[in-house]
Amino acid sequence: MNGFSHFNEQGRAQMVDISEKSSTVRTAAAVSSVHMKNEVYEKIQSHDIGKGDVLAVAQVAGIMAAKQTSNIIPMCHPLSLSGVDISFDWKIKEAEVILHIKAQVKTKGSTGVEMEALTSASVCALTVYDMCKALDKGMVIGPTFLLEKTGGKNGDFKRELSEYNLEDQK
């Protein structure tokens, strides 16, 4: 099937056999964002959201999501993660506030952690939305993308943010 490793000879889905791949340190970082009204930002900052500390809950949700990625992405291998770190950065604009979320994941294993990082960043953003939707159902999530990855036979990857007009997503 022309370069896609998740298909067998019959064109059906398969989980790739990684038993012959060497175990190396692998990392990945993914980002997402939540665009919201100033009012939502102020309530998050003052811990005035009825459901609790939004960023603390989102952080735990992101860590849990990284650990559970193989349960929701069918062809992902279950991995023993060495670490997951979530960071948040606010960008305050005139008409809106943007919460930038960065998920960094690390393992020593036979396959990469890109999907774990992407899942983690996505679930963080979804959790923020869930906890704040009573104030602003018009929040926008995204973009969500892989920022960088290291390790593995395909080598390292680092996204050039200027290519996609994403300089403020760092």
UniProtKB/Swiss-Prot annotation:
One of its GO terms (biological process) is Mo-molybdopterin cofactor biosynthetic process. Substrate binds at M75, C76, H77, M115, E116. GO terms for molecular function: cyclic pyranopterin monophosphate synthase activity. Pathway: Cofactor biosynthesis; molybdopterin biosynthesis. It catalyses: (8S)-3',8-cyclo-7,8-dihydroguanosine 5'-triphosphate = cyclic pyranopterin phosphate + diphosphate. Keywords: Lyase, Molybdenum cofactor biosynthesis. SUPFAM superfamilies: Molybdenum cofactor biosynthesis protein C, MoaC. The active site is at D130. Its EC number is 4.6.1.17. Catalyzes the conversion of (8S)-3',8-cyclo-7,8-dihydroguanosine 5'-triphosphate to cyclic pyranopterin monophosphate (cPMP). Homohexamer; trimer of dimers. NCBIfam families: moaC, PRK09364.1. Belongs to the MoaC family. This is Cyclic pyranopterin monophosphate synthase. It comes from Bacillus subtilis (strain 168). The gene is moaC.
